[in-house]
Amino acid sequence: MKIGNIDLGHEPIFLAPMEDVTDIGFRLLCKQMGATMVYSEFVSSDALIRMVNKSLAKLQVCEDERPVAIQIYGKDVDAMREAARIVVDQAHPDVLDLNFGCPVRKVAGKGAGSGMLQNVPLLLDITKAVADAVPDTPVTVKTRLGWDTPGLYLPDGTPFIVDLAERLQDVGIQALTIHGRTRAQMYQGEADWTLIGEVKNNPRMHIPIIGNGDISTKERVRECFDRYGVDAVMVGRATFGRPWIFRELQGGTLSLDEKIDILKQQVITSVERIDEYRGILHVRRHLAASPIFKGIPNFRETRIKMLRAETVEELFAIIEEIRALLKTEN
């Protein structure tokens, strides 16, 4: 599979863009675990134009994580065009991705993210403006099946996402990622891959189609490639507390000790990138969500302790207690 001139190999697996999750430290860790391409947290176009330091910091990229995509969002043509130029000039990403899928109220409720699905003409104008503004960088889009269930099909019976995919391709995108839910669903229920498959199997489409939604096992990955024919799959929430998932999805296995050591490395990376207090604050909720801790006796109390830890020493002591307990249980 290729996005522009970037060869991503056969059946690649991507790390999804996630706010307050996919910072450079986490991206590097997932890359080490086998992610083919990684995506940044989304960045506000308005904030980039205003040169807000917090948003500019999200443009930090290192060579070891390439190929890497930086994702931007917004609802103004001029702002998105200018933000795209800033991203390309400062970060030199391999791919520039446009977020037309974020369902959270503070984004979609203001007309950005998945809110753009209610204004397709503007969505297309933004996409074309960005693609024209950065012709040497592949522009891609991440979106959802539609705004809500009533809007899944056009009056003539054509699936909304099939029509949108064609129109996005026509204005210059070089790959399309589709999350298999509507905005109204948020993250409830199961992702519907049937419509993703219809986009991929549309003879008009020639750009890569990347499927996203409920990817957590190697069996599911196999089904998505074989049954729906997508060119790549993208993993999001299943990476929480489980950055090694990419190795597992490719058929690899890790011991309990290896998994716990990876979580400790995530702590170290977070602290080194920021500082001890803020690094711990950022990473501890990821550790508390790790599936390897589920099922141990009285984990609720242990989880609370983990979420209250303020130093590396304190957090590591809790992790080692859990390691010993898990070994005893096994």
Predicted regions located by residue number:
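Active-site beta-loop-alpha junctions enriched in small/polar residues
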Residues: 18-20, 43-45, 73-75, 101-103, ...
